Amino acid sequence: MRKLATLLVMAMFGFAAGAHAQTPVTGQSSTAPKASTSPKTGTGTAHAAYDRALLRPTMLKDKAPDTYQVKFVTTRGEFTVTVTRAWAPTGADRFYNLVRHHFYDNASVFRVVPGFVAQFGLSAFPPVSAAWQRANIKDDPVTQSNKKGYLTFATAGPNTRTTQIFINLKDNSALDSQGFAPFGKVDDPGMKVVEMFYDQYGDNTPNDYQDLITKQGKAYLDAKWPKLDSIKSATLVGEPAPAAKPAAPKVTAPAAKPQ
């Protein structure tokens, strides 16, 4: 079991450091979004194919437009994100390349803490998660506050952003001083969709929760956390997708063992 680096300024949030997000207690602040750092993988995978270009992160480094939009289709409905590259250029470029190659398609919104954040960005497919585990990008300066509806990368420490994103469900200005740099914003009507994401699991998850998602993919979440919402697709608005490389073969996920 790996240990995840905590992202908190502990005195601010009042939690001890640990391997995974601490369970929030009524009246206390929730832990800041953190990202998995484990390189371990497994054989479970969702029943769909992925763009094999995602297995080579070093090749996906196109510069994003100054502004662009991404349409999300989810199990709760649709919303649109507008990205402003000047807010966080490195993060905006990474997000652009991930969306172009459909990284977020079929991914679950695996962490939703009421009144705090909705977090996603662990691939439905273990081989893809494995490929991006060490594909870190450098931090951007924080030029925008973590306001309600703003999108920001989760991290596991300085210069460790990879693929995980969170949407602020309220104004979380306390995250600004910790280096969380927003790069986009959900349209106002779309926030009604985001606020419907299933949130009753909260942070009541195992210490190795993200590790299990990384190793087993969506198969694990569907078996153990079946009420989670997911992203059916995330696509660039008004821009054709790049020519897809041969898709990975479908693999049947192993039967989940009872807890």
What does each of the following model-derived ranges do?
Residues 7-16:
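Bacterial N-terminal signal peptides
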Residues 1-4:
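Positively charged n-region of N-terminal signal peptides that target proteins for export
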Residues 21-259:
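Cyclophilin-like peptidyl-prolyl cis-trans isomerases
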